[in-house]
């Protein structure tokens, strides 16, 4: 039993313009070298581009994209008797959102294009429609979990 107190889970703060936690989570993940103002600029430009492309509420597109990419289950390497098994584990909503944001940003960075705002907006629109690299990554993870379902009892 630990003698230290339990750590309270921090709630994500919301961003100054949209008052949205998901936007703030995106900003914190896109951040490089402590340049937060640049990260905010990239996200806000991407949101404007989404608005121009879809002519709908860009935050609903963002929510839909993250909901579409969020995995329900993932695999974790577990060493049992000298061999390593990929054990499927369920993922909580917070961890799932974090993974989804990471996958969306990774897919956006790999895209060819002019700038990050353009690439991110394209990836978010594609993910909201159900296509794109981030969606493919989620499906691949689910396939891995399904293939290794026999090892689920190793949890």
Swiss-Prot record:
Molecular function (Gene Ontology), one example: rRNA binding
UniProt main location, coarse: plastid
Key word Iron-sulfur present: no
Compartments where found: Plastid, Chloroplast
Listed SUPFAM superfamilies: Ribosomal protein S7
Keywords: Chloroplast, Plastid, Ribonucleoprotein, Ribosomal protein, RNA-binding, rRNA-binding
UniProt keyword Cytoplasm, yes or no: no
InterPro entries the record matches: Ribosomal_uS7, Ribosomal_uS7_bac/org-type, Ribosomal_uS7_CS, Ribosomal_uS7_dom, Ribosomal_uS7_dom_sf
A single GO cellular-component term on record: small ribosomal subunit
Pfam families: Ribosomal_S7
GO BP annotations listed: translation
Functional note: One of the primary rRNA binding proteins, it binds directly to 16S rRNA where it nucleates assembly of the head domain of the 30S subunit.
Subunit (UniProt): Part of the 30S ribosomal subunit.
Entries under PANTHER family matching the protein: RIBOSOMAL PROTEIN S7 (PTHR11205)
Matching NCBIfam families: rpsG_bact
Family of the protein in this entry: Belongs to the universal ribosomal protein uS7 family.
Record-given protein name: Small ribosomal subunit protein uS7c
């Amino acid at each position: 039993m630990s003698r230290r107190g339990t750590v309270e889970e921090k709630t994500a703060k919301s961003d100054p313009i949209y008052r949205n936690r998901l936007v703030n989570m995106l900003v914190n993940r896109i951040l490089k070298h402590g340049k937060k103002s640049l990260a905010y600029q990239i996200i806000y430009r991407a949101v404007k581009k989404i608005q121009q492309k879809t002519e709908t509420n860009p935050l609903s597109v963002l929510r839909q994209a993250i909901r579409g990419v969020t995995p329900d289950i993932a695999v974790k390497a577990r060493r049992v008797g000298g061999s390593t098994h990929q054990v499927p584990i369920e993922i909580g909503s917070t961890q799932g959102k974090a993974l989804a944001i990471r996958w969306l940003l990774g897919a956006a960075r790999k895209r060819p294009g002019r700038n990050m705002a353009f690439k991110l907006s394209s990836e978010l629109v594609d993910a909201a429609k159900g296509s794109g690299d981030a969606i493919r990554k989620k499906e691949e993870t689910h396939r891995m979990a399904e293939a290794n379902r026999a090892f689920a009892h190793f949890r």
